[in-house]
């Protein structure tokens, strides 16, 4: 039995953010960010790009969340997007994330101008080290 607000398909508006149906395999959401108006949500899904992983965008339509598209991390087929922070201060959101290697992973960014937006590597951790999260900090 479905409960009120539960999605019935990938394109059905939902009161819940549900990454099921956004690719193949089991969805694996690991980080998220909402714009200040709570009308746009980004979910970092650590599946490979070929399986639907990347940064998924959802839009609030007034009744529920609707999947828009996935920003696929294609700089490496073996790397996935993990943690997530977003800057909504400009005309287009700028998203920052870490990748999922256990050593020598990356901090990446992408400006969301649509589903074909390209990622840029900002930093690579030294061998034996890894970035484990990402967040904004105020300047002193």
Regions found by a protein language model. Name each.
Residues 1-140:
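Beta-propeller fold recognition
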């Amino acid at each position: 039995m479905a409960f009120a607000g539960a999605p019935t398909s990938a394109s059905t508006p939902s009161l819940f953010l549900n990454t099921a149906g956004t690719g193949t395999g089991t969805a694996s959401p690991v980080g998220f960010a909402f714009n200040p108006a709570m009308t746009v949500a980004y979910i970092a899904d650590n599946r490979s790009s070929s399986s639907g992983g990347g940064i998924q965008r959802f839009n609030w339509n007034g009744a529920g969340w609707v999947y828009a598209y996935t920003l696929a991390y294609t700089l490496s087929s073996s790397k996935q997007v993990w943690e997530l922070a977003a800057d909504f201060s400009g005309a287009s959101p700028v998203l920052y994330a870490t990748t999922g290697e256990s050593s020598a992973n990356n901090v990446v960014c992408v400006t969301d101008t649509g589903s074909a937006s390209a990622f840029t590597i900002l930093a690579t951790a030294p061998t034996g080290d890894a970035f484990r999260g990402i967040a904004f900090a105020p300047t002193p």
